[in-house]
Amino acid sequence: MTDIADVIRSLMREVPDFPEPGVHFKDLTPVLADARGLAEVSKAIADAARGADLVAGVDARGFLLGGAVAVTLGIGVLAVRKGGKLPPPVIGATYTLEYGTATLEVPAEGIELAGRSVVVIDDVLATGGTLAATHQLLTRAGANVTGAVVMMELAALGGRAALEPLEVTSLYTA
């Protein structure tokens, strides 16, 4: 059995001093661009997401992972979009960034979310703001959010605590 954390670690690119001096940026793009990497990450996320009847992929790399996982599980995928990208009406949630705010949205019509078991998928858990906003807007739409699955967690930023009591699964922790 392959350890998924080893797969991610072996394919991930580390970029020193980006986006600013002293930061070691962990670029997951090579993991997703590698056929084996994408397949193994998708399978590991799908294993963690079993039992949901809808995947919510968060803009933007959550779309890639969410689509692959939904196909694997034989369920649908919902794109959780950045604000202003969907036609009205929408259900949105605003969250705080380091220098301002951002909004995430899902359609308010055309997709029945009430009572559905939804798992949220994203590439990285950092401060937890994006996933918390996603959880909030899906819950407001009536969905039962069963958990969140991320490819990588930046543990030092404390995002997991911001999401309690939501169950969070991370494939790789940095």
From Swiss-Prot:
<comment type="subunit">
    <text>Homodimer.</text>
</comment>
<dbReference type="GO" id="GO:0016208">
    <property type="term" value="F:AMP binding"/>
</dbReference>
<protein>
    <recommendedName>
        <fullName>Adenine phosphoribosyltransferase</fullName>
        <ecNumber>2.4.2.7</ecNumber>
    </recommendedName>
</protein>
<comment type="function">
    <text>Catalyzes a salvage reaction resulting in the formation of AMP, that is energically less costly than de novo synthesis.</text>
</comment>
<dbReference type="GO" id="GO:0005737">
    <property type="term" value="C:cytoplasm"/>
</dbReference>
<dbReference type="GO" id="GO:0006168">
    <property type="term" value="P:adenine salvage"/>
</dbReference>
<keyword id="KW-0963">Cytoplasm</keyword>
<dbReference type="GO" id="GO:0002055">
    <property type="term" value="F:adenine binding"/>
</dbReference>
<dbReference type="Pfam" id="PF00156">
    <property type="entry name" value="Pribosyltran"/>
</dbReference>
<dbReference type="GO" id="GO:0003999">
    <property type="term" value="F:adenine phosphoribosyltransferase activity"/>
</dbReference>
<dbReference type="GO" id="GO:0006166">
    <property type="term" value="P:purine ribonucleoside salvage"/>
</dbReference>
<keyword id="KW-0328">Glycosyltransferase</keyword>
<dbReference type="InterPro" id="IPR050054">
    <property type="entry name" value="UPRTase/APRTase"/>
</dbReference>
<dbReference type="InterPro" id="IPR000836">
    <property type="entry name" value="PRibTrfase_dom"/>
</dbReference>
<comment type="pathway">
    <text>Purine metabolism; AMP biosynthesis via salvage pathway; AMP from adenine: step 1/1.</text>
</comment>
<dbReference type="GO" id="GO:0044209">
    <property type="term" value="P:AMP salvage"/>
</dbReference>
<dbReference type="InterPro" id="IPR029057">
    <property type="entry name" value="PRTase-like"/>
</dbReference>
<keyword id="KW-0808">Transferase</keyword>
<dbReference type="InterPro" id="IPR005764">
    <property type="entry name" value="Ade_phspho_trans"/>
</dbReference>
<keyword id="KW-0660">Purine salvage</keyword>
<comment type="similarity">
    <text>Belongs to the purine/pyrimidine phosphoribosyltransferase family.</text>
</comment>
